[in-house]
Amino acid sequence: MLNIKWIRENQELFDEKLSQRFIEPMSSKIAMLDQEKRKITSLIQEFQHARKVKSKILGNMVSKSGEEFEELQRDVNHINEKLAELEQNLDNNNELNELLNMLPNIPDEEVPYGIDGSMNKLVRAYGKTNKNALNKQHFELGTKLNLMDFEQTAKISGSRFVTLKGDLAKLERALINFMIDIHTKEFDFFEISPPFLVRDRAMYNAGQLPKFSEESFITTNGYRLIPTAEVSLVNIVADTIIQREKLPMRYVAYTTCFRSEAGSSGRDTRGMIRLHQFGKVELVSITTPEESKNEHEYITNASETILKKLDLPYRVMLLCTGDMGFAAKKTYDIEVWLPGQNQYREIASCSNCGDFQARRMKARYKEFGSNETTLVHTLNASGLPIGRTIVAILENYQNNDGSITIPDVLINYMGGLQKITTYSE
């Protein structure tokens, strides 16, 4: 959520930043609603003070009868009626909060202006891309190996699901352990095993609700399946005040993630690129405003390191204003090279959300010995999605005979296996 005080004091700049996100000016409407809310709040405070004063006088009166007592009693009753009316008006006046809840984060000054992904900015690239036209796509390789099943899985669960078998299932498990080891041992992230089912409040805190309600799965009793472990991890600090010396707090978790892929009809209908259910290692950092810029580079480097150790070609893109996620103020996308598609595809998103999520979930920190609190900054990064990493390995490590060479760093995790070959049932 955006800072209403900042909007009040920077209306022209606020509208300019909204325009970069292709949203019409909102400052005038917000200022009007804010003024109404502040007026009601001020009246409530005045009546509460008056009630306190008169109630104290009533309590100190020796005689609990007589004209003066009855007049004061009527005044207190009248104040209670007015307070109830004003508080009801305040509860009903939700338009301001509803409007603020639908507005995305303000882009950082370093974010380039742009309409869509075609206007993102190249930051750096790693590795050499293989542009052999004979390269096969991952789903061709996986099904030919008899280790990737879409057809039978569709009978079980429908479209956008997959079953991995044998050495591909083993590769999935190896990647999870490999990624967690790197993030915990080399980057000092603390491993968490969080819940996959969360309440609406947790989704709201992370910026998933109310805007993206249709993109998540909801159970019959009101829980939602997490679209990313970011939701569970950032909420670890919801409604807390953290001592400054404990920051940064860095969390890593592997979870299954669930997405309805609403609005993705016709996109990536074949293969493992866009599934309803997928595994992902997620990174979350909680830090101070002063350190969040450096932490953004740190958490991005952690994601990049996985790809470097796997020797997968990739590039880092700074997203433009029109391509950023809702809660982010600045985002790097890491795109891995897929020779079967002859193009780069997103494999990780690394975002600095500033105090946007923290304001929603009231996550603050304070210096030792001080009572003054400040909102934390939250950051997140994919570290990485397991399915898309398997896709990248299959396409970049494919051999002419259809077998897949295991990346060197994964051989021990694969029990010494150096090559995946066709499975015969």
Swiss-Prot record:
Q: Name one GO cellular component term.
A: cytoplasm
Q: Which SUPFAM superfamilies match?
A: Class II aaRS and biotin synthetases, tRNA-binding arm
Annotated GO MF terms: ATP binding; serine-tRNA ligase activity
Q: Catalyses which reaction?
A: tRNA(Ser) + L-serine + ATP = L-seryl-tRNA(Ser) + AMP + diphosphate + H(+); tRNA(Sec) + L-serine + ATP = L-seryl-tRNA(Sec) + AMP + diphosphate + H(+)
State its Enzyme Commission number(s): 6.1.1.11
Q: In which pathway does it act?
A: Aminoacyl-tRNA biosynthesis; selenocysteinyl-tRNA(Sec) biosynthesis; L-seryl-tRNA(Sec) from L-serine and tRNA(Sec): step 1/1
Q: Which InterPro entries match?
A: aa-tRNA-synt_IIb (IPR002314), aa-tRNA-synth_II (IPR006195), aa-tRNA-synth_II/BPL/LPL (IPR045864), Ser-tRNA-ligase_type_1 (IPR002317), Ser-tRNA-synth_1_N (IPR015866), SerRS_1_N_sf (IPR042103), SerRS_core (IPR033729), tRNA-bd_arm (IPR010978)
On whether Nucleotide-binding is a keyword of this UniProt record, the answer is yes
Taxonomic superkingdom: Bacteria
The record lists L-serine as bound by T228, A229, E230, E282, S382
Keyword Magnesium among record annotations: no
The UniProt entry, under Pfam families, shows: Seryl_tRNA_N, tRNA-synt_2b
Q: Which family does it belong to?
A: Belongs to the class-II aminoacyl-tRNA synthetase family. Type-1 seryl-tRNA synthetase subfamily.
Q: What is known of its domains?
A: Consists of two distinct domains, a catalytic core and a N-terminal extension that is involved in tRNA binding.
Quote the NCBIfam families the UniProt record gives: serS
Q: How would you summarize the oligomeric state and partners of this protein?
A: Homodimer. The tRNA molecule binds across the dimer.
Instruction: Specify the protein name.
Output: Serine--tRNA ligase
What gene name does this entry carry? serS
